[in-house]
A protein has these predicted regions:
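Short proline/glycine- and polar residue-rich coil/turn motifs
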Residues: 93-102, 279-285, 454-458
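Polybasic, low-complexity, intrinsically disordered segments
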Residues: 2-170, 174, 182-189
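Primarily recognizes the serine-hydrolase "nucleophile elbow" in alpha/beta-hydrolase
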Residues: 575-631
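Short, solvent-exposed loop/turn and secondary-structure capping segments
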Residues: 239-246, 272-275, 302-306, 313-324, ...
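A conserved hydrophobic secondary-structure block that centers on an alpha-helix together
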Residues: 282-308, 312-313, 457-499
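C-terminal subdomain of alpha/beta-hydrolase-fold enzymes, centered on the catalytic histidine
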Residues: 543, 547-550, 615-837
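Acidic, low-complexity Ser/Thr/Gly/Pro-rich repeat segments typical of extracellular/periplasmic
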Residues: 148-414, 418-440
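Cap/lid segment of the alpha/beta-hydrolase catalytic domain
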Residues: 437-462, 475-577
Length: 837
């Protein structure tokens, strides 16, 4: 202790000596005084606190200080997110005195108008004196009544996407939203769906949908319908008043002032869309505004939805929800659940600004992430790979048959069935089962740690029915028959193979053999055991989707059985002769093809995408995206009587259907559209598809088929659709026409077949024939019209076109000679039409 104070005394003495040696003490104070004087002379400007009310009344005040006597030029600007910088007040010139000077300047008329809005705004002043420049800035305090937001209900803010105020709509709307995602660095998108059970819709028994099957997804559907409740846009008239892009004129999505816009954040481009009100809602207050993609969203894409400058049917502006205004207008609040999302929304506004969409004009804006291709096909692809491994084929991308054929057993052989069926063969074939209950109709996947289906201990015995035409059995040396598998209709059965005009005509007239199996998941047995229970309680919906994927595998095994040299052709039932005595196989096993009609034309999409064997598929009256198809189908009324009472809230119904789409994507073409033709899944060949459609189809919406064609990159025949049939429709928008020099066309294609308008049959005036074009609203066509759904299956033109397509290096010809394609009972003569009274 003494040593420390001793050293301190020595240091103090040394410091005193240094001060004396340094000379007069007055030198240092003089220098400091000069520096202080110089600092005091520095030019400064400060914008004084200002509110909207004070600015509108008195203008803006600034405090200026600097060298006394100096002349200062002041200029005033204000800035906001949208405008950048604008003049706030006229410039002023002042002379400074010894004290700081407060200057008050009135705001310009434009500045007062801008300040009257609730947009966050900065008041900026620039002072210039000689070479000195000074700047000052202050945020404008927004105190007008319109900018003082009423409190919002945040009691459900942790589970509800609250920006549209759930008390005015639905907890999960707007939908889809990245509010319902979490980060997952192991997923292809970097995200994972995260629906809380408290947010999910409930059925009439107050049972919420369990989100576990949804939360495995890495994003929303690639064909996801967008839903939001906008009070004031409750009717078709309200929609029309906003000039949204309508279904009949899709090109309007790109209009500069379009009020509903969806932006691809990667490309900055607008997504083609159409906008409509839910026409199925009987209560306008429960009618959702619906936005649909006209071509599927990019896999793994992030999109921003922006609604702006909305009005009601009378032209009255609709004020944005207060919850969203906290973000749009940057209104301060101490509420944590609001503040924690500010950074996210600022990013949205910056992206929209690049797209020239003003923040101040927004009614609502939000974002969502789209699922990856892998998300949709990975389970079914895993099942395919594991199943084919059991028969010795692990290299399926080379389109070469390897390993053994699946086991099968013929159970019945019928000869001389009718004039077009010489032999009908039925039996069963063995398929690895990946469902509980040994693939019974109420089974579902048992998933492993990788979220992939585990194989059951027992195999599944799938049924088959095959028809052989007379040409394959007659004569001493009958031709080998081209094999194709047939996909049946809605909740149908394999036995439709014997009765479908397309199978009967293709086999009998074009030397083919057709086989079918029940498309389990949506086969006849599933109608009451799977579909109806799911409509009553969507917690069971995964059973339908899981079973559909098993059904895809069954179809792939049947095609291998037809394609393999050691397959069906090894049984006498598939050999020439009497069907019992061994003979020569009637099957040409070099190739195999797919033909599906109605539901088979739908389910043929994912089956084609996964197929290692058939690379050419004909999809008749097909389409995709069941959430779009259902309410637009004449079949829906049968199921709506079950679904609607089960989910009585009209606003929740379209949400429930769009939620199911996220699961349906694992087993229907909407989830495979990006990989069906080119860009196939791993270890899979590329494919070509022809889509043969009926104009005005009552069961499978033409609009959904058009989206499918755009997404898959199909082309259509030069004639397209007769303008006289659909004068107000921008038909086949963004679907390229096949040029004359491109025929025979070997790529993927779509062709509409027209059975003519609704009219009297000239050969029988007591009979109505023909149909109108489909309604633009999301409802089924007029039931009074004739349903053309079956026309392409029995018409000579489509059958001939499919025949040339279902060949090695197959093609479609210009069968309609550059004109719209017409079914057999319509010649295009509008002048001879006899109207229905």
């Amino acid at each position: 202790m003494h040593s420390f104070f001793g050293r301190l005394a020595i240091l103090a003495a040394a410091f005193s000596f240094m001060l004396v040696a340094a000379g007069p003490a007055s030198a240092t104070p003089v220098a400091s005084s000069a520096t202080a004087s110089k600092k005091q002379a520095k030019l400064k400007v400060k914008v004084l606190p200002a509110s909207q009310a004070s600015l509108l009344k008195s203008g803006v005040k600034v405090r200026v200080s600097g060298r006394p006597g100096s002349r200062v030029k002041l200029s005033f600007r204000s800035s906001s997110f949208d405008e950048g910088s604008r003049t706030l007040a006229k410039p002023r010139k002042i002379r400074l005195g010894k004290k700081a000077r407060v200057v008050k300047v009135p705001a310009t008329a434009g500045a007062r108008a801008a300040a009257s809005t609730c947009a966050a705004r900065s008041l900026n002043a620039l002072a210039v004196s000689g070479k000195q420049r000074a700047r000052g800035s202050r945020a404008l305090t927004r105190n007008l009544a319109d900018c003082r937001l009423a409190p919002i209900d945040i009691t459900q803010a942790q589970v509800c996407e609250f920006i549209a105020q759930p008390d005015q709509g639905n907890c999960m709307m707007p939908f889809p939203s990245d509010f319902y995602t979490r980060k997952d660095r192991n997923s292809p998108t970097g995200k994972r769906i995260s629906f809380p059970v408290a947010a999910m819709p409930k059925n009439r028994n107050n049972v919420s949908i369990d989100p576990k099957n949804w939360n495995a997804s890495d994003g929303f559907s690639q064909g996801q319908g967008i839903l939001v409740k906008v009070p004031g846009i409750d009717t078709a008239e309200d929609v029309a008043a906003n000039d949204f892009a309508p279904l009949q004129t899709l090109s309007r999505y790109a209009e500069r002032n379009q009020r509903a816009v969806v932006i691809n954040t990667k490309t900055g481009e607008r997504q083609p869309i159409w906008v409509e009100i839910d026409a199925n809602a009987t209560d306008p207050d429960k009618a959702a505004l619906m936005i649909s993609p006209a071509t599927n969203f990019d896999q793994k894409g992030r999109y921003i939805v922006a609604l702006r400058n909305l009005v009601d049917a009378d032209g009255n502006s609709l004020e944005a929800p207060n919850a969203f205004r906290y973000y749009r207008d940057a209104i301060p609040t101490s509420t944590g659940v609001i503040n924690q999302r500010r950074g996210h929304f600022e990013g949205i506004f910056k992206t929209l600004r690049k797209a020239k969409i003003k923040r101040s004009e927004l009614y609502l804006a939000w974002d969502f992430t789209v699922a990856s291709n892998e998300n949709n096909y990975r389970r079914a692809l895993h099942m395919r790979d594991e199943a084919f491994k059991t028969i010795g084929d692990t290299s399926m991308g080379d389109n070469v048959v390897q390993g053994a054929a699946p086991d099968f057993n013929v159970t019945s052989v019928e000869d001389n069935v009718d004039s077009k069926i010489a032999r009908r063969v039925r039996g069963f074939f063995t398929v690895p089962c990946f469902m509980t209950k040994d693939c019974a109709s109420t089974g579902e996947f048992k998933l492993d740690a990788r979220d992939l289906p585990e194989r059951s201990d027992n195999d599944y015995q799938a049924n088959f029915e095959c028809i052989i035409p007379p040409v394959g059995l007659e004569g001493a040396n009958p031709p080998k028959l081209r094999p194709f598998i047939y996909g049946h209709g809605l909740f149908g059965l394999a036995l439709e193979n014997s009765f479908s005009p397309v199978t009967r005509d293709l086999t009998a007239d074009y030397e083919s053999i057709s086989c079918a199996t029940d498309e389990i998941g949506m086969a006849g047995i599933d109608r009451f055991t799977v579909a109806v229970p799911a409509l009553q309680d969507m917690n069971k919906f995964n059973q339908l989707v899981d079973r559909l994927q098993q059904g895809l595998l069954n179809g792939l095994f049947l095609s291998r059985l037809m394609h393999h040299p050691d397959g069906l052709g090894t049984d006498p039932a598939f050999q020439d002769g009497d069907g019992v005595t061994p003979g020569e196989s009637v099957i040409d096993t070099d190739e195999v093809y797919y033909v599906g009609a109605s539901q088979g034309g739908i389910m043929g999409g994912p089956m084609t995408a996964l197929s290692p064997d058939f690379t050419q598929s004909a999809l008749i009256v097909g389409g995709m995206n069941y959430s779009t198809l259902l309410t637009r189908s004449s079949n829906w009324s049968t199921f709506a009587v079950i679904f609607n009472p089960s989910y009585p809230d009209e606003l929740s119904r379209p949400l429930v259907l769009n939620l199911t789409q996220m699961l349906w994507d694992r087993g229907e073409p909407n989830g495979y559209a990006h990989v069906t033709t080119d860009n196939p899944p791993p270890n899979t060949p590329a494919h070509n598809v022809t889509l043969q459609l009926a104009l005005g189809d009552h069961q499978v919406s033409n609009f959904a088929a058009d989206v499918m064609a755009r997404t898959m990159g199909m082309k259509t025949n030069a004639g397209g659709i007769d303008d006289r049939r659909w004068p107000d429709y921008e038909d086949l928008w963004n679907i390229p026409r096949i040029g004359a020099s491109e025929y025979p066309y070997r790529g993927s294609s779509m062709v509409y077949w027209d059975g003519g308008p609704y009219r009297l049959n000239p050969d029988n005036l007591s009979q109505d024939i023909g149909t109108g074009v489909p309604p633009y609203a999301n409802v089924a066509p007029d039931g009074q019209w004739e349903d053309p759904h079956g026309a392409p299956r029995g018409a000579s033109g489509p059958i001939s076109m499919m025949n040339t397509f279902l060949q090695p290096n197959g093609f479609i010809a210009d069968a309609c000679n550059g004109e719209p394609c017409r079914a057999d009972d319509w010649d295009g003569d509008f002048d001879s039409i006899i109207p229905v009274p």
